[in-house]
Amino acid sequence: MTEVTALVTGTSRGIGAAIAAALRGRGVRVIGHATRAVDDETIAADFAEPSSPQLVWEEAIDLADGNIDILINNAGLFEANPLDVSDIQWLDSWEDTLRINLTSAAQLSRFAVKHWLAEGTGGRIVHIASRAGHRGDSPDHWHYAAAKGAMLALHKTIARAYAADGILSYAITPGFTDTAMAGDYLASRGGGGLLADIPLGRVASPQEIAAIALFCALDAPPSMTGATLDANGASYVR
């Protein structure tokens, strides 16, 4: 049986770590990515650097002996960018967030699509977007909402363009998830009030999001390509 290999970005913690564990539990070889490498199967790179996505892809292809079947775009940055900071601070934060949350995903998706077209094999991309891509975010997070909304447009475009080639694209839009990134924000905004906006009464766990990603990566039927799966405790219902 041919080994299935996945490249997953942002695997050091939270959703990315849970996705990597879930895939490995199904026998998938996972090549991870983090700002700092933790093992021989994790590639270290800072996606704020424009050249990093290409270097990650090339190293992943080498580690995988030329065969990557699944790409999961999970790496992300969620930092406040208030209106009253200096103009240059606001712009720097905007550009860093879009580069890490959107541009790196677009670059890696491009490399993956080109690879699968050349090999004639097909493949799957799973984009970890956000509820913010649908309904917007706080006044301090224009950049995050814009990046995640654009990721959804990227996902739909890939799905429509390459379905006939066996290249499938799925997106997941979590609401608040129990990660360090979201936890700091919940605490700063008064977590109880925000939880009141979630009919389920709690945030999602990383393992719940990982279960959806696992389904998209391995089990979702091809006819679902282009689908966006929400996981927000009914805090935003489309």
Model-found features: residue ranges?
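A short, exposed helix-loop element centered on a Lys and neighboring polar residues
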Residues: 109-110, 156
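A glycine/serine/threonine-rich, flexible loop-to-helix segment
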Residues: 164, 176-198, 208
